[in-house]
Design a protein with these regions (language model features):
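Structural preference for solvent-exposed beta-strand-turn elements
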Residues: 1-378
């Protein structure tokens, strides 16, 4: 294997691929990245056995072939090379080394056998569809904050992506919950997604997928089976894009519809950004363990307060739109902030029942994104 490539293209491809590699590995080859040179393209492949990322970049290939090298070291070397450098990479099979040269810099990295590098098994996907990157970005960004980090409830450790019925017909829906808060986000159902099996996309995969979605003009091809989900950038078919394949969580997502309140009568309308900032301010004195903040609602008036015996107290009043009975209700400040930060519109609408029942929040009159948060005693 021998090729030369622009440093910027190499760094972009290696950065994306190596991000799935775990720093500590009991299987040595999983710490490596596979470089494969063929035609006028270099393919970079990395895996942790649950996620596989393949990135591609154009290069001048003098000799086809492949080798595996430490993902972390290779990435660090390329990152530290000067901007605009032309990087020459060459494998010496006899020595078991790969050399990296740019200008007056030269490095050698040890290799492990290419044939030992694991490949994710091929899959027959039940549904394949194309979706604009901004649509997928919205689905994941507005739901992933609610993913559970409790490993014993593994079936909550991801975003549940599925086809659902809404008042406007069938939609592509993303749901996440940790038992304390829930996010449900809808998007128009793409053509080809009708037979999509409901799958739970793991937290780490969501983080890696999100890196593919920053280009507003990009289209992403999504393929789903009962056990795997694949995301490919539009240019992947042309040999220069990224393909990410992940196993999905083998579990049953709970019946989330049961916890979404349907008829909470008390309505609060508040400036979302102002509300989030106020919660942040009063929570400064809350205890680290509970982070409790009390909402006291009266006619067109909201008082946020914290009373922490060990550290102090805080109170802030906001002008709001509220015309129902008085209500005092407590929440975890972090949960309120994270939900309020999802609001793209100016106003957030909270629907309450009483101090012990779940509260519903939505963005203005937009029904495509709703959030549920459980109260706590204060």
């Amino acid at each position: 294997m021998k090729f030369s490539i622009e440093r910027a293209a190499l760094l972009k491809a290696v950065s994306q691929a190596q991000s799935v590699v775990e720093r500590r590995n009991t299987i040595p080859i999983l710490a490596n990245i596979l470089l494969d040179a063929e035609g006028d393209t270099i393919r970079f492949r990395a895996t942790d056995l649950d996620i596989e990322v393949i990135d591609r970049a154009p290069a001048k290939v003098d000799r086809a072939g492949g080798a595996t090298v430490s993902a972390q070291l290779f990435h660090e070397i390329v990152r530290k090379l000067p901007d605009g450098a032309l990087v020459a990479v060459e494998e010496d099979g006899a020595k078991g080394r790969v050399s990296i040269a740019a200008g007056r810099s030269r490095f050698e990295l040890a290799t492990l056998p290419k044939d030992d590098f694991p490949a994710m098994a091929s899959e027959d996907f039940a549904a394949t569809f194309t979706c604009p990157a901004p649509t997928l970005r919205r689905l994941f960004d507005k739901s992933r904050f609610a993913i559970s980090t409790e490993e014993t409830r593994y079936y909550l450790n991801g975003v549940y992506l599925h086809v659902a019925e809404s008042d406007d017909g069938r939609v592509l829906r993303a749901v996440a919950t940790d038992g304390h808060r829930l996010a449900r986000v809808d998007a128009a159902l793409p053509e080809g997604a009708e037979e999509l099996p409901g799958v739970i996309v793991p937290r780490k995969a969501v983080v890696e997928i999100r890196k593919l979605l920053d280009d507003d003009e990009a289209d992403i091809t999504v393929s789903v089976s009962e056990t795997k989900i694949r995301f490919a950038t539009e240019s992947a078919e042309a040999g220069t894009g990224i393909t990410l394949t992940s196993k999905v969580i083998d579990g049953t997502f709970p019946d989330y519809a049961r916890v979404i309140p349907a008829a909470n009568p008390r309505k609060l309308e508040v400036d979302a950004a102002e509300f989030a900032r106020a919660v942040d301010r009063v929570a400064t004195v809350s205890s680290e363990r509970s982070r409790a903040v009390k909402l006291s609602l009266d006619e067109d008036r909201l008082v946020l307060s914290v009373n922490a015996p060990d550290s102090g107290a805080a109170e802030e009043e906001l002008a709001v739109a509220y015309a129902d009975e008085k209500l005092e209700i407590g929440f975890n400040a972090k949960y309120l902030q994270e939900i309020a930060q999802q609001v793209d519109r100016e106003n957030a609408v909270f629907m309450f029942n009483n101090a012990g029942d779940p509260t519903l929040m939505r963005e203005g009159d937009d029904p495509t994104a709703i959030y549920v948060v459980m109260p706590m005693r204060v």
